[in-house]
Amino acid sequence: MRISVSVVASNVVVDNDLISLDVGGEMTLADLKAVIQSDINIAPAAQSLFHNNQLLTDDSKTLSQIGVVPGDMLGMHIRVPGRELAGSQGSANPSARTTQESLARRQQALPDPETLRLHMLGDPRVYETVRMQNPQLAAAARDSRLFREVLSAQQRAEADAEAAKEAKIAMLNADPFNLDAQREIEDIIRQNAVSENLHNAMEFSPEVFGRVTMLYIPAEVNSHKVKAFVDSGAQVTIMSPECAAACNIMHLVDRRYSGVAKGVGTASILGRVHLAHIKIDDLFLPCSFTVMEGKHIDLLLGLDMLKRYQACIDLKDNVLRIRDRNVPFLHEADLPKHQDEFANEPLIHGRGGALIGGRTGAVTHPAGNPGSLAQNAQTLPARANLAAPVGTPSSSTAPGRNPHSPSRWPAESISKITDIGFTREQAIQALDAANGDLEGAIGYLI
């Protein structure tokens, strides 16, 4: 089985603070420490291992007896005798010393700022990606002196944040048997695992950060051309009131079927058109439409229509197969105009500096700071075609808001969101991003 060992505190420098090991359930704790020694050259006597906030003291127990299962992460404190004095001598200003060391490491890893600036200006793809991730740095690219100042300021801010994190870990490890401290250490270990998972996704599966276009086909209803959204997750076929009026079938709406649709939010159902013909390719197919407000989509082909005519969504050939006809899905350039709104959708400031799309929920800038954007610029040509860039400058801050400040949105909408467990501030931010659309606001928050 594979487990991980995270070095959460150490009075010596180790080559790797996160170790992945293949071990057996019958391996003893002493054997595990020997394996760790072979990886990072730390003697077993200096290793203190923790599992589920419990210090492991019996080296004769096997991993199975301890309760270690595949995928577990153990915490490890390293205390090498004779090193505490050296550490205390330099502890007069540990935060400043750590900041300087971190800044020096970053500067060594980065190329010369002028080389980096010229690289950005020489490759439009790199410049555009940096502009989306770090507008301040991109805006300074035309001025060599200003670029150097902005880059240095961002590096110092990142180094300060890293130093503060290391200082917090050191403070927590000052009392390793404090339960509250151990809970915080466990949370730090979890966050490190999340960051590692993000980096692995960026390296091995960058396509997961891309933007997927929805499936539309050309159709006609009552001789009116419409772009129909194919949605096998919808129970019924839905049409907007505007589209029904344009198709001249609004007078056929049976309002006895009106009501409220509940799901992620609510929408008003005006009624039902029991029978109308929809033209797909050269086929004229009888269809019923539920006329519903609150949707950006003119026509949505639901499961009732798809199952009735045994339609097949073929993603390999990018076609909808229906009655022996192959109807190609529309290309991105041919999608309805309202889809363009998502390209310039408003952004909401999340925790840790994350920027999140107010409508799609796509994370434009992940929380935290996995690395300097300037440092990542060297690898941007390989990722320049990604729709959703990754990384964010540490200077991103969420604007403050008084939780009881007046809002331009109806109190009823805010109340509906707060009733399901969110704060008033979150409700107002979500409504701002969704331009007052209650369903979109709830969808983002969920």
Curated annotation (Swiss-Prot):
The record's region (Disordered) falls at: 387-412
The alphabetized list of GO BP terms reads: protein transport; proteolysis
Instruction: State the EC number(s).
Output: 3.4.23.-
Location of this chain's protein in the cell:
Cytoplasm
Q: Show the PANTHER family listed in the entry.
A: DNA DAMAGE INDUCIBLE 1 HOMOLOG 2, SODIUM-GLUCOSE COTRANSPORTER REGULATORY PROTEIN -RELATED
Complex and partners: Binds ubiquitin and polyubiquitinated proteins.
Family (UniProt): Belongs to the DDI1 family.
Q: What is this protein called?
A: DNA damage-inducible protein 1
Source organism of this protein record: Coccidioides immitis (strain RS) (Valley fever fungus)
